Structures are given as structure tokens and as C-alpha cells.
């Protein structure tokens, strides 16, 4: 059952009640319980049960009418909440009031009989006292309960493109397809590298340190007839750019791509081309084609994609390779900062593995970059009218509304809308924030808000990675008002 009033309408009623007196049951003057009942009657036409105020959360069935929250250190009350104080108030009967404002440190309420002046004449029925509904500030306490009515819905002015709107249903439309790779097998002729005698144990992904012109075709032209002296400087099994894969060595051959006997003999080497000269968009496409080729080969060999089968050049020797991928996906530049730390190495490997597994499952993954990297251009790009896109690949739009969390905690992030960003705090069930920005990033819809001078980023539903306005969204994790 929905309330007869919207939240804003009820808050206006609370404001008009200040200075008045309420004796709903016509007993013992103007009790705090009477004021709670007056508000409940305005909302639902019903009266609350309970011998004292402290009994309200337990003596009533709030199913469909309201949600009851027990106070926690991180709970944030909302205007319109009924707050119930425990038996350490009101001579054991508790106390009840209506919240009009709240922070994490205190609540401001309208209440009746806080000072005990609601019944002073000694006459039981109806009774009289001098105390009236008063606005007052209180600290949170334990135990304390907050009862949030199911208010009549209000229409919030939001863009039709906003991801806080109802989920866009996926309709029958062409699904994205993987790029059709053009695989050119043209084995080098200047030297017949030895055979391994078995399938590779996995794949080593390299960055070629090549210029913008160092495409797969360019490597083919330069190496396919190169002499042994040139091949000894290094030759991988495949070179990838755009949708082109040049296979320079047979799968059965060893390569000279890791400067390490184990890496050369047992692992198939793939170079992601143009890693020094291409723009980020081009290089990321080259990476995706590489992941697609890795998926094809692993399936062919009957191997899974994991940390044993997907390797990095820097696991075999001290090198900055794969330098460009490291910067884009971990934010760490091994060229300027030294060898890639182990945690960053695992972060990069796991990203590669996740992308490759998606291709192995017939899916089309979305390339993501670290919020610490300067991916794409340094300018904000307009996208799909209401949306813009920043240098980190984040789609964003201005929107002012209130998000109220549902029944599960949500991890809030600082710095930016990425799951890899530092944790701010746990956004508790029933908590709310007044946000000013909506973003699409890292598989989620995020809202941005400022609290006590700190900017926070809160994911509120999933996002399938499609660019707006064609995004497909999961269920909202709370309510927007």
C-alpha cells in the first residue's frame, strides 16, 4: 500500500504541524505517540499499535507500508522517516518523532512531549499540557529504529537518456560480432627454426615497441625473407594489427621472443603491433584482435585461459614489455618507473585473461583502461546529445536527484567511477545521497555526489558496456526520487 502523500507533501505537512498539539487517542494529553499517529493517519488513514513508542517497530505489520531500519554507525536517516528511541527514553516507554533533516552525526526532528510537558493537568481523558510540536536536534543513539514510509511516487525530471530511468529492455537487434580476423600464414624463409615436438603450453603477449607504421603487414614485408642474423634479434610467432594476423612461424616451431629458453621453446609469442606510435584507440583495437587470436589458439590446443597459459614477456626476463598495455590497464609505466611490480603484473594478466575468456565463450568484451592512465585524448567529447565522454572513456551527464539504497550495502569509491579505485565507505541499506552527476564506466552506472568536502562515486546498477544512448542496464539497486 502506497502512502496518500508524496515525501515532499508529507514534509510540508510536518512543517505546518510545528507549534500545534495532537491528541489522536484522546488520552493523557499530547503524547509523542499521538504525534506519530497523526502523521501515520495522514499518510495511510491508519493508527499505530503499541503500549509505548518503543513498541512501534515490533507491534505493527509494515509490509507494503514502510521499511524498518535499525540504526548502525553508517546509517543516514532521511526526511520523512519516523524515528523510534528505545526504552532508555520516556521513563521506559521510549520516544518517537518525525525526521526533517539528517546528517551522519545528528538528526533534526519534529516531536511532541520531549520535555514531558504534553500532559500536565492530571486528567486522563482527554488530558492537557503546555508542550507543542517542536523542531529539535538529536544525536543518533543505540538502539534506535527508523521507519521509512512507502511514499506516493514523485516524478523526478530526468533526461530520457538517463541510466537512472527504468531499464531499457533489450530488443531483437543485431548483436555485436567479433572482428573477422585475416590470418596470413607466411612462415619466415631465412632460417627454419627447430620444432618443439608438441603444442605450446601457452601464449606470451608482447608489445612490439613499433611505430605507427609498424603494422602486421609491415613486419611481414620486413621479416619474411630476412636472414638468420636478423631473426636472431627476435622473431615471434604472430604479429597483430587491425584485423590482420601475420603468422611468421608455425605453431610447432620454437620462437625467439622471450630471451629465455623456456619461454622460447614452450610458449607461442604474439606481438601487439604499433605500441609506440599508434593512438590509444588503435592500439586497443590491436589488443582486442590479439585476444581474439589467443582465444582461437587456446581452444584449438584444448587449453584454458589462466595465469599459467597467458604469460607476459616480463615474466621471463627483465624488460618493460608489454609497456603500452601496462600503462593502459594498470596505470604503471615500466619505461619511466622501472620493472612492473608483481601486483600490477597480476592485474594486467588477469585483464588479458578476462578478455580472452570472453572471446572463448563467444562474447564480445569491452576494452577498459585504468583510471590512472591518460587514455584517449585529453578533451571532453560530446556523445549522444545529453552525454559527454572524458579522457578516461567515462560517459557522463549532469543530473540532480536523490538515490536511496535498497536492502544491500554498496561499496562507495573515491577518486573516480572505477571498481579499482580506493574504497570510500559502505553505503548502507536505506541510506541516501543527493547526486549531481551520472556516469557509465567499468560495467556500472555510477552517481557522483559530494559529502563533507569529499567527492564520492556510487554504483547503482550494472551496464553492459554499450555506448549511449544504446546502453542496456540492470535493475536499479534502490530508488530515485
UniProtKB/Swiss-Prot annotation:
Gene3D superfamilies found in the cross-reference section: endopeptidase domain like (from Nostoc punctiforme), Peptidoglycan recognition protein-like, SH3 Domains
EC class name: hydrolase
Pfam (any one): SH3_5
Keywords per UniProt: Antimicrobial, Bacteriolytic enzyme, Cell wall biogenesis/degradation, Hydrolase
Residues of the SH3b domain: 398-466
Region (Disordered): 155-177
Entry-linked InterPro entries: Amidase/PGRP_sf, Amidase_domain, CHAP_dom, Papain-like_cys_pep_sf, SH3-like_bac-type
Superkingdom of source: Bacteria
PROSITE patterns assigned: CHAP, SH3B
Protein family according to the UniProt entry: Belongs to the N-acetylmuramoyl-L-alanine amidase 2 family.
Role played: Has weak lytic activity toward S.aureus cells.
Stated name of the protein: Probable autolysin LytO
Amino acid at each position: 500500500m502506497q502512502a496518500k502523500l508524496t515525501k515532499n507533501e508529507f514534509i510540508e505537512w510536518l512543517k505546518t504541524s510545528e507549534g500545534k498539539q495532537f491528541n489522536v487517542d484522546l488520552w493523557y494529553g499530547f503524547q509523542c505517540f499521538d504525534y506519530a499517529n497523526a502523521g501515520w493517519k495522514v499518510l495511510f488513514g491508519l493508527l499505530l499499535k503499541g503500549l509505548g513508542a518503543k513498541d512501534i517497530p515490533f507491534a505493527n505489520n509494515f509490509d507494503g507500508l514502510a521499511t524498518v531500519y535499525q540504526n548502525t554507525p553508517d546509517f543516514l536517516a532521511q526526511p520523512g522517516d519516523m524515528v523510534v528511541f528505545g526504552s532508555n527514553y520516556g521513563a521506559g516507554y521510549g520516544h518517537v518523532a518525525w525526521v526533517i533533516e539528517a546528517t551522519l552525526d545528528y538528526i533534526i526532528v519534529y516531536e511532541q512531549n520531549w520535555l514531558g510537558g504534553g500532559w500536565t493537568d492530571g486528567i486522563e481523558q482527554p488530558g492537557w499540557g503546555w508542550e507543542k510540536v517542536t523542531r529539535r536536534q538529536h544525536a543518533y543513539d543505540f538502539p534506535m529504529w527508523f521507519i521509512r514510509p512507502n511514499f506516493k511516487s514523485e516524478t523526478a525530471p530526468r533526461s530520457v537518456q538517463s541510466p537512472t530511468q527504468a531499464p531499457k529492455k533489450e530488443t531483437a537487434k543485431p548483436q555485436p560480432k567479433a572482428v573477422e580476423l585475416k590470418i596470413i600464414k607466411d612462415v619466415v624463409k631465412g632460417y627454419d627454426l627447430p620444432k618443439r615436438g608438441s603444442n605450446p603450453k601457452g601464449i606470451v603477449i608482447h608489445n612490439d615497441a613499433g611505430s605507427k607504421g609498424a603494422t602486421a603487414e609491415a613486419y611481414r614485408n620486413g621479416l619474411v625473407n630476412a636472414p638468420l642474423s636478423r631473426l636472431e634479434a627476435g622473431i615471434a610467432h604472430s604479429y597483430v594489427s587491425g584485423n590482420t594476423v601475420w603468422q611468421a612461424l608455425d605453431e610447432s616451431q620454437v620462437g625467439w621472443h622471450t630471451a629465455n629458453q623456456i619461454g622460447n621453446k614452450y610458449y607461442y609469442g604474439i606481438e601487439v603491433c604499433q605500441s609506440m606510435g599508434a593512438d590509444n584507440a588503435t592500439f586497443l583495437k590491436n589488443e582486442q584482435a590479439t585476444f581474439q587470436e589467443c582465444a582461437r589458439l587456446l581452444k584449438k590446443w584444448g587449453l584454458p585461459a589462466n595465469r599459467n597459459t597467458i604469460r607476459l614477456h616480463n615474466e621471463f626476463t627483465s624488460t618493460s614489455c608489454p609497456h603500452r598495455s601496462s600503462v593502459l590497464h594498470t596505470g604503471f609505466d615500466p619505461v619511466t618507473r622501472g620493472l612492473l611490480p608483481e601486483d600490477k603484473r597480476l592485474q594486467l594478466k588477469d585483464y588479458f585473461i578476462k578478455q580472452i575468456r570472453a572471446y572463448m565463450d563467444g562474447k564480445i568484451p569491452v576494452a577498459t583502461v585504468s583510471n590512472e592512465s591518460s587514455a584517449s585524448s585529453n578533451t571532453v567529447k560530446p556523445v549522444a546529445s545529453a552525454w559527454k565522454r572524458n579522457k578516461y572513456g567515462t560517459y557522463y551527464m549532469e543530473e540532480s536527484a536523490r538515490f536511496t539504497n535498497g536492502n544491500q550495502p554498496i561499496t562507495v569509491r573515491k577518486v573516480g567511477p572505477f571498481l579499482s579505485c580506493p574504497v570510500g565507505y559502505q553505503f548502507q541499506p536505506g541510506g541516501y545521497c543527493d547526486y549531481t552527476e551520472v556516469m557509465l564506466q567499468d560495467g556500472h552506472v555510477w552517481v557522483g555526489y559530494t559529502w563533507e568536502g569529499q567527492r564520492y562515486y556510487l554504483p547503482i546498477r550494472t551496464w553492459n558496456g554499450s555506448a549511449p544512448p544504446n546502453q542496456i542496464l540492470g535493475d536499479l539497486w534502490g530508488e530515485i526520487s
